Amino acid sequence: MNQAFWKTYKSKVLQTLSGESEEDLAEERENPALVGSETAEPTEETFNPMSQLARRVQGVGVKGWLTMSSLFNKEDEDKLLPSEPCADHPLAARPPSQAAAAAEARGPGFWDAFASRWQQQQAAAASMLRGTEPTPEPDPEPADEAAEEAAERPESQEAEPVAGFKWGFLTHKLAEMRVKAAPKGD
C-alpha cells in the first residue's frame, strides 16, 4: 500500500474518532496556517529505561513472565528495596547509627534470592518428575555463608558465582522461554 492511502485512511479514522466533519478537515488542508505545527515530543516513558526494557521483554509472553515473577513475592520486594529516608529533605544524609543499622539489617541481594528460589523450584520440579515429595530447603543465612567463604578463601570473592549459579544458565533459560513463546512459521 502506498503512503497516500495510509494518510487518507488515517484521516478517516481520526475523523470518525474525533467527530470532526469533512468540511473542517478540508478547510484545514487548504489553509495550513490553521493547523499548528505539531512536533512529536517524546513522552517521559520514552526515556524511562524500565519502559524500554518492558517493550523489549513483551515478546516473552505471559507464561514466561508468570514463571519469572513466581520466583519472588511481596516479602522479597520489601526486603530488597531500601526504606524511604525519614529526614526532612530526601537527599539529606542519614545519621551514622541509622545507616549502620540499615546495612546490617539488609538481607540477601536480588540475584542471591533469585538464584536460591530458582534452584529450589528446579529441585522441586525434578523431584516431581521422579515422583517423590519435594523437600523444602531452608534459605542459608547469607551473612554466615559469606563469613565462612571469606575465612576459607581470602582471594577475590568475584572469581566464582554464588553457589554455583551461572549467568549462562539464566541467559539460556531466558532465550529458551523466548523461543517457546515465538510464533511458529511455515
UniProtKB/Swiss-Prot annotation:
Organism: Homo sapiens
Start-end of Low complexity biased regions: 90-105
Region listing for Disordered, in residue ranges: 17-47, 77-105, 121-164
Record's compositionally biased regions (Acidic residues): 136-149
Protein known as: Uncharacterized protein C1orf232
